[in-house]
Amino acid sequence: MLIVVSPAKTLDYETPVPTTENTQPRFLPQSAELVDILKQKEPWRLSELMGVSDELATLNANRYQSWSLPFNEDNARQALFAFKGDVYTGLDAYSLEQDAISAAQRQLRILSGLYGVLRPLDLMQPYRLEMGTRLQNAKGANLYRFWGDTLTQSLNEEVRETGADVLINLASNEYYKAVNEKKLAVPVITPMFLDMKGGKYKVVSFWAKKARGMMTRYILQNRLQRPEEIKNFDTDGYSYNPALSDGAQWAFTRDH
């Protein structure tokens, strides 16, 4: 199986990385094209474009000004260890065994507004560019137009290379929209995570994001190969709920 997840806005370029192994992103020419557009924007323009504070806009303007090829261990970091948001708190990559990191390199793909698709050990320089950003480019008015079918084609190549027979979608809607599901070569299963709140099961954003990371970790640590095995996921009190599941939408619920 092949897993897709979202990136994170929060980054960590300080904590020592537990491996020296690294690879290069596959779409660096496209990334460079986007960076060239972003380099031309003043911080206040980035603030408007990204909906961030002046401080964050200045930080990212500086990031884009210093973004340069080639990537190496001195100026970049493996994606799996660079992202630090809720999904990656649940995944807890720094505590994965080497075998699980190797499994991640084969099975896990991170969708990215700037880099397209990243393998866990692909080096990346720090950035902020969410997939939903309306960045005018040569192909259209946003990043969905920029990437077009590139991400879908890339995932299909990964499917052929790895022999995966299903895609496990653990990405957010914002990022998964960049994939044309109708053109994927394999079926898709989308796990949903719901918590009991106010007498009803609801998607609570923070917990759902963390749970996506925990399920990714569960798949990698246990070397799962068949989608049915995912139904045994029980981390942090979640369990498969057949009554709330519908076709390829698999529900996992938790009571508090």
Curated annotation (Swiss-Prot):
Q: Name one GO biological process term.
A: response to hydroperoxide
Q: Name one GO cellular component term.
A: cytosol
Q: Which Pfam families match?
A: H2O2_YaaD
InterPro entries annotated for this entry?
A: YaaA
Q: HAMAP family, alphabetically? A: UPF0246
Q: Which family does it belong to?
A: Belongs to the UPF0246 family.
The protein's name is UPF0246 protein HCH_04801
The organism of origin for this protein: Hahella chejuensis (strain KCTC 2396)
Lineage, opening ranks: Bacteria, Pseudomonadati, Pseudomonadota, Gammaproteobacteria, Oceanospirillales
